[in-house]
């Protein structure tokens, strides 16, 4: 406005406007000339700011800045500057007073940028009306571009503003433009492109491009949801990034379905103090929200301050129990450290980056669960010695709120795949009869899914504690080998060890007073398992803790696709049955050299139409049993596609029980507070087997958290300050000298 206020008002005041009108130029040429001249001055002022972008790129840690997003932000700034310019020219064309032109232009620009957004916040606008009102203002469209997202809707909106005020200026000059028709055409264009919108995501990781399945799920939502993001207030920058990314994602959801979602970013407990504050946190913890104590650096002294925060969100839909989302990721990243250290320092920035990558999946899944019309039935199988005690407490709690969970006794009937979507077979200890296997086989032939969590050998840590330090693990004899082999999988009778493993407290000697010295030592019988990054079940999850796993081989079966989900690390070995479980395993001299194998499979996904184990050998008694129990005939091959996950360590899905604290989460040992990704692996497996395939597809999204390298900033602080403060001024000065020199030579007489 300060630049454009002289455009026409000075011409009116000095009487030169009449001279200009006598020149052979049209009103369009006159307005365009004024517009381009003023916009050129604005661009000259903006271009030196590119120096800031180059400086940030040089000081960044990994990957540099996202130049695609930077280009998009400059596009947005260009459109915004163009709109302010044309508005200023229009206001200048209706007044002779420069000051009036300046003040009115500022007011109009401010109202267009902030006014509609503020109006949309009023409580009277509900059911999506607030979203459409905010879209009338400049801010909503500029914010998309500033993030690197170019949409047809935003571009058409900005062009409409330019055309509207440019024609207004021409009308003031000529007075013969059909203004009403123009406005009607512009409104029609904006409505059309708001419905048939397309976008160009300039960001490097395509962070604003939602997966196709996500778009379909959000568009189909018919129950409005309210999201509470508890990441407001003074929190570390890496959590700020998560909050901003979550808000941006929810805004994209709202653009797809304005009635689907509303949200706010809250400061947890800002209205409470002392005991009331603790009660507030306790109530949120009861709902399942994560409560985390963090240490933040405060001020230039880098003094560390303890702080409670809630890195989670609560989604509410009327008439349903709310769903809690943990915005963190189970996959932890660590700074470079000496391997001798027990507890490496977590790289919070990198971990937060992994969390951002999972936001689309987490919010989409929660909204899908709250809006689905049919809830799948999952049955926990009993009848063959499966545990029904506290060791499967977390397993039940993990899925009982999202699915219909029940117990099915295999001895009492045939599981019906039309009623039961998935069977959970967890740690059976008794052999399966031929009739048992027939029941499971026909369940698979009918399209039912099964999770097999089996212990091939009898090997328990409790048994070791009752011996002198060693015992022999033997075959559990479950009689399932032929059934699994028919489906293309074989669990071998062995134990797998790996040097990347859990550390257990062990007696390593005696102190001076004769008391035992206890130290946590690596125990390769409890290896950490790595996920296959190419499959959504295990993509972007942390290590999975296992207890005495066996190796798995896959066998070619026509029409069956098999995918390795979990495997050991790069320093593994196999102990064939009868395998000795020794407290000192891996410690003997020269023994480490035997860990030469790598990536031994421990969990496998098999999917397709499976062949029946009993093909060509089903007896008349079996046929009668099937007919009597199901009312249907024997199925020789699968009539529908089925999915099976075979895990060679049942304890991956069970939890330990602490004497004082009770049942622990999956993947947590009593003497550690670190929780491995066993729970994530389980719930992702359940989602893959029971929900639409596309629901997990968004887990594959990767986003790089672009942060400054603090060491570079500190080393070059003075130089950076000098460049950022004086650099733009120097560039503007050089431009002035070059421009004035050019004009002198161009117009010299």
Question: Language-model features: where?
Answer:
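Secretory targeting signals
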Residues: 32-98
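Transmembrane helix boundary and interhelical loop/hinge segments in multi-pass membrane proteins
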Residues: 2-21, 35
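Hydrophobic alpha-helical transmembrane segments
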Residues: 80-81, 141-162
């Amino acid at each position: 406005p300060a630049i454009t206020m002289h455009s026409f008002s000075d011409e009116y005041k000095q009487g030169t406007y009449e001279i200009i009108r006598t020149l052979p130029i049209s009103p369009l040429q006159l307005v365009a000339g004024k517009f381009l001249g003023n916009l050129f001055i604005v661009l000259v002022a903006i271009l030196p700011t590119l120096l800031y972008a180059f400086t940030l790129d040089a000081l960044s840690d990994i990957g540099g800045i996202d130049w695609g997003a930077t280009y998009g932000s400059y596009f947005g700034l260009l459109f915004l500057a163009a709109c302010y310019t044309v508005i200023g020219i229009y206001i200048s064309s209706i007044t002779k007073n420069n000051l009036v032109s300046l003040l009115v232009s500022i007011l109009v620009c401010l109202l267009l940028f902030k006014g509609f957004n503020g109006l949309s916040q009023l409580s009277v606008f509900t059911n999506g009306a607030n979203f459409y009102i905010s879209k009338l203002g400049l801010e909503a469209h500029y914010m998309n571009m500033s993030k690197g997202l170019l949409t047809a809707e935003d571009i058409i909106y900005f062009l409409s503003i330019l055309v509207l005020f440019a024609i207004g200026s021409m009308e003031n000059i000529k007075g013969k433009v059909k203004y009403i028709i123009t406005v009607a055409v512009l409104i029609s264009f904006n409505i059309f492109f708001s419905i048939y919108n397309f976008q160009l995501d300039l960001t490097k990781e395509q962070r604003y491009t939602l997966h196709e399945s996500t778009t379909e799920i959000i568009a189909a939502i018919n129950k409005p949801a309210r999201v509470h993001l508890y990441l407001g207030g003074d929190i570390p920058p890496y959590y700020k990034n998560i909050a901003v990314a979550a808000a941006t994602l929810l805004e994209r959801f709202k653009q797809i379905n304005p009635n689907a979602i509303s949200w706010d970013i809250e400061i947890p407990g800002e209205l409470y103090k002392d005991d009331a504050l603790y009660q507030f946190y306790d109530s949120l913890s009861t709902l399942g929200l994560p409560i985390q104590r963090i240490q933040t650096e405060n001020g230039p002294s880098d003094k560390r301050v303890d702080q409670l925060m809630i890195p989670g969100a609560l989604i509410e839909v009327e008439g349903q129990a709310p769903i809690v989302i943990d915005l963190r990721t189970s996959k932890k990243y660590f700074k470079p450290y000496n391997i001798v250290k027990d507890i490496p320092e977590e790289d919070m920035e990198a971990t937060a980056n992994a969390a951002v990558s999972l936001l689309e999946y987490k919010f989409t899944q929660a909204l899908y669960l709250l809006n689905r019309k049919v809830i799948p039935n999952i049955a926990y199988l009993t009848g063959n010695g499966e545990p029904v005690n506290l060791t499967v407490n977390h397993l039940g709690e993990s899925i009982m709120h999202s699915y219909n969970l029940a117990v099915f006794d295999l001895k009492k009937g045939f599981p019906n795949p039309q009623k039961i979507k998935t069977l959970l077979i967890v740690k059976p200890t008794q052999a399966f009869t031929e009739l048992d296997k027939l029941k499971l086989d026909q369940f698979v032939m009918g399209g039912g899914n099964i999770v097999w969590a089996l212990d091939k050998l009898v090997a328990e840590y409790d048994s070791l504690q009752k011996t002198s330090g060693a015992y022999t693990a033997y075959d559990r004899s479950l009689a399932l080998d032929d059934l699994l082999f028919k489906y293309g999988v074989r669990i071998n009778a062995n134990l797998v060890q790996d040097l990347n493993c859990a550390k257990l407290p062990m007696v390593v000697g005696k102190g001076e007073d004769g008391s035992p010295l206890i130290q946590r030592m690596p125990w390769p019988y409890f290896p950490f398992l790595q996920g296959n990054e190419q499959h959504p079940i295990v993509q972007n999850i942390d290590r999975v803790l296992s207890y005495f796993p066996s190796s798995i081989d896959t066998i070619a079966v026509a029409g069956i696709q098999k995918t390795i989900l979990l495997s050991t690390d790069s320093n593994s070995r196999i102990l064939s049955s009868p395998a000795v479980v020794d407290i000192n395993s891996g410690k003997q001299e020269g023994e480490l050299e035997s860990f030469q194998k790598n990536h031994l499979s421990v969990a496998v996904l098999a999917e397709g139409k499976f062949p029946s184990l009993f093909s060509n050998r089903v007896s008349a008694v079996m046929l009668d049993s099937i007919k009597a129990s199901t009312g249907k005939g024997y199925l020789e091959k699968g009539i529908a596609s089925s999915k099976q996950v075979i895990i060679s360590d049942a304890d991956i899905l069970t939890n330990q029980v602490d004497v004082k604290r009770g049942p622990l989460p999956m993947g947590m040992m009593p003497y550690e507070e670190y929780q491995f990704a066993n729970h994530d692996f389980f719930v992702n497996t359940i989602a893959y087997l029971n929900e639409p395939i596309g629901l997990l597809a968004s887990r594959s999204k990767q986003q790089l958290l672009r942060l400054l390298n603090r060491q570079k900033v500190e080393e070059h602080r003075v130089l950076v300050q000098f460049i950022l403060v004086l650099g733009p001024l120097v560039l503007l000065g050089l431009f002035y000298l070059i421009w004035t020199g050019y004009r002198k030579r161009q117009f010299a007489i």
